[in-house]
Design a protein with these regions (language model features):
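C-terminal accessory segment of soluble enzyme catalytic cores
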Residues: 179-258
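N-terminal lobe of the biotin/lipoate ligase/transferase fold
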Residues: 1-154, 205, 239-258
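Conserved phosphate/anionic-ligand binding catalytic regions in large, soluble enzymes, centered on
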Residues: 163-176
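Short, acidic Gly/Pro/Ser/Thr-rich loop/turn segments
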Residues: 55-56, 164, 179-181
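Active-site donor-binding loop signature of nucleotide-sugar glycosyltransferases
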Residues: 13, 159, 200
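Residue-level recognition of well-ordered beta-strand positions that form the cores
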Residues: 100-102, 158, 171-173
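Glycine-rich, charged/polar anion/phosphate-binding loops
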Residues: 153-161
Length: 258
């Protein structure tokens, strides 16, 4: 059966994490409603963006567990959010390409429908991109994410699947900017692992926006789906996405300058 395309949208401005999370929840609810009322009518989408500085904790951590860290990290000027994704404490911010695929895994068949297989495909997208676009060799790891050596992590993966619909996703360090923020925490609960970026690994200046076309192409290749840009005015999904884009129109930090 020919599967419908995956739409994608690349935000041109840095988006606060909480606002992007609210968008994901709205899209998830829309997909669930449309799938119930008109099966196969709902659209899958890949959101690509940068966040303003934020530390996020995974669903296994609680307010009590993170109270001291929250106070310390917010004093540095970052937001702090408890998220309903897998994984532990991590950082998002400028210089990092974040991807939120909102997909219906029930559209796939067999073992590919499972969460583990989905996570493996996300990691494959990132590994392919790093190898083909930058000549970087990734290292298999028992830990979730993408590594350039046993102790050098360049990308994180943390997902949530409800009713077969995915939220959250991946974050890939592009410039050196995220590394300073990572240096203030034990990221992902791995004290012996350091955060690296494409820029630090290659020794060449990188721009986040330049990574988007390659990630989109390889995402479609691994998922075996056509990738189509989300056009403004093309239904409820587009309305939700472009409303958020307009909301942060005045944000000084844009992907074109990163």
């Amino acid at each position: 059966m020919l599967l419908p395309p995956i739409y994608y949208h690349h935000f041109q401005r840095c988006i606060p994490y909480v606002r992007a999370l609210k968008l994901q929840e709205a899209i998830h609810a829309l997909q669930l409603q449309q799938r119930s009322e008109f099966p196969a009518s709902h659209q899958d989408i890949l959101l690509l963006l940068q966040h303003t500085p934020v530390y996020t904790a995974g669903r296994r951590q609680t307010e009590a567990d993170t109270a001291q860290e929250r106070a310390r990290l917010t004093a540095l000027g970052a937001d702090f959010v408890l998220a309903q994704r897998g994984g532990e404490l991590t950082d998002h911010g400028p210089g990092q390409l974040v991807g939120y695929p909102l997909l219906d895994l029930e559209r796939t068949s067999g073992a590919a429908r499972g969460t583990r297989a989905y996570v493996e495909r996300l990691q494959r997208v990132l590994a392919l991109h790093l190898g083909e676009a930058h000549g970087l060799v990734t290292t298999p790891s028992e830990h979730m994410g993408v590594f350039l050596g046993a102790r050098r992590k360049v990308a994180s993966v943390g997902v949530q699947v409800r009713h077969g619909l995915t939220t959250h996703g991946f974050a890939m360090n592009v410039t050196r900017e995220p590394l300073g923020w990572f240096g203030r925490v034990v990221a992902c609960g791995l004290p012996d692992v350091e955060a690296v970026s494409i820029e630090s690994a290659t020794g060449r200046e990188q721009r986040v926006g330049s990574e988007v076309p390659g990630i989109v192409e390889r995402f479609g290749r691994v998922m075996e789906r056509e990738m189509v840009p989300l056009e403004e005015g093309s239904g409820e999904l587009a309305k939700l996405v472009h409303t958020l884009e307009q909301e942060f129109r005045g944000n000084e930090r844009t992907l074109s300058s990163s």
